[in-house]
Amino acid sequence: MSRPQVTVHSLTGEATANALPLPAVFSAPIRPDIVHTVFTSVNKNKRQAYAVSEKAGHQTSAESWGTGRAVARIPRVGGGGTGRSGQGAFGNMCRGGRMFAPTKTWRKWNVKVNHNEKRYATASAIAATAVASLVLARGHRVEKIPEIPLVVSTDLESIQKTKEAVAALKAVGAHSDLLKVLKSKKLRAGKGKYRNRRWTQRRGPLVVYAEDNGIVKALRNVPGVETANVASLNLLQLAPGAHLGRFVIWTEAAFTKLDQVWGSETVASSKVGYTLPSHIISTSDVTRIINSSEIQSAIRPAGQATQKRTHVLKKNPLKNKQVLLRLNPYAKVFAAEKLGSKKAEKTGTKPAAVFAETLKHD
C-alpha cells in the first residue's frame, strides 16, 4: 500500500493525533480468482436441504394398456366421463407426472475448501478494502470519507443506542452509503418473493470491532450495515457476491489487532502454522523493471520491424516461373542446359557381359 500510516477519527468525524501503522495483511496479494473460487464454494455451505415429495406424480391409479392398441405403453388413468381418463401418468414426459430423477435431501450440499486457500481469499479481501478504486467500483458511496481504510475511535464499540451509532456513522462520512441502501430496496424478481426472500437491497458498510460492548445490537437494525469481529472475519461479508472492495469501518482496537490475528514480519499469527501470502515480485511496476539498465543490458536489441501481409495469393510454382525460381533457383540452370531431355551416358560394359566373356575364354 502507498499509505504507511492511517489516521484515527473520533466519533464526531474529527481527525485525532493518533496515527496507526498499516497492518501487514493489507499488503497481501489481491487475487480475484481465488476469492471467486472460495466464495462460490463457501456460499454453498449455508444451503438448506430440499427435495420434492416422494409421492409427487404418483398419487393416481394408472395402468398400461399394453400392446396391440397402437398407443404408447405409458400407464394411463382409468375410468371415463372425464378428460383425465386415458391420459398418461407417472412418467416425466406426462402432464401431472413426476419429474425426472426426483431430488433427494441426501444430496452432497457442502463443499470442502482448503484451509490455506480460504485464508488466502480472506486476506485478499481485507487488502482490497484499503483500495479506494475497488471500493468505489463496487458501488459504495465513499466520496466524503476522509481516508480509506477508515479507522474510528474504539469508543464506537461501547455505543448501545441505534440513534447514537447512526449519528457516528454520519459524522465519519458514511451517510451517503446508508442512503444508497435505503433507496435500493426493491421487490425481488422471481419465485423468491414467496419464499421469504421478498425484498432485495444493496450492502452498506461493514463495522469491524475487537470487543462487543453494545455495538452489535446498536447496528443490527440499520439497513445494509453489518458487524463482524476482527478475530473471525468472514469472506462472505468482506466480499459479498465475490466482488472485492467492501466499505469497512475499523475500530482502533480492531485495526491494531490485525497484526496479531494475521501476523506480520515481526509478529507471529494467532493462526497456527500460517504465514501471510506475499507477492511474486516486490515491484508491481513491470514497465520500470523492463526498462531498467540491468535488464536492458542483458537483452539483445530489437530487430527490424516486419509487417505481415494480410492476404497472400498462393500461386502454383509449376505454372508460375517466378515462383518456381524463388523456391528452386537451380531450376533456371536445369532448363537452360536441358538436363531433363538428356539421356544418361553409359559408364561402361555391364557386369553380366563381362562375366559372359570370361566364361567364353575359359
UniProtKB/Swiss-Prot annotation:
GO MF annotation terms: RNA binding; structural constituent of ribosome
Record organism: Saccharomyces cerevisiae (strain ATCC 204508 / S288c) (Baker's yeast)
Effect of I289A: Leads to an inefficient release from ACL4 with a delayed assembly into the 60S subunit
Modification sites for N-acetylserine: S2
Family: Belongs to the universal ribosomal protein uL4 family.
Complex formation: Component of the large ribosomal subunit (LSU). Mature yeast ribosomes consist of a small (40S) and a large (60S) subunit. The 40S small subunit contains 1 molecule of ribosomal RNA (18S rRNA) and 33 different proteins (encoded by 57 genes). The large 60S subunit contains 3 rRNA molecules (25S, 5.8S and 5S rRNA) and 46 different proteins (encoded by 81 genes). uL4 is associated with the polypeptide exit tunnel. uL4 interacts with its chaperone ACL4 and the nuclear import receptor KAP104.
Keywords: Acetylation, Cytoplasm, Methylation, Nucleus, Ribonucleoprotein, Ribosomal protein, RNA-binding
Gene: RPL4B
Domain notes per entry: The eukaryote-specific C-terminal extension harbors a nuclear import signal and delivers the ACL4-uL4/RPL4 complex to the pre-ribosome, triggering uL4 release from ACL4 and incorporation into the 60S ribosomal subunit.
Name of the protein this chain belongs to: Large ribosomal subunit protein uL4B
Mutation effect (R98E): Leads to a slower growth at higher temperatures but allows RPL4 assembly into the mature 60S
Effect of I295A: Leads to an inefficient release from ACL4 with a delayed assembly into the 60S subunit
Location (main, coarse): cytoplasm
Effect of F334A: Leads to an inefficient release from ACL4 with a delayed assembly into the 60S subunit
Family matches, as Pfam families: Ribos_L4_asso_C (PF14374), Ribosomal_L4 (PF00573)
PROSITE patterns: RIBOSOMAL_L1E (PS00939)
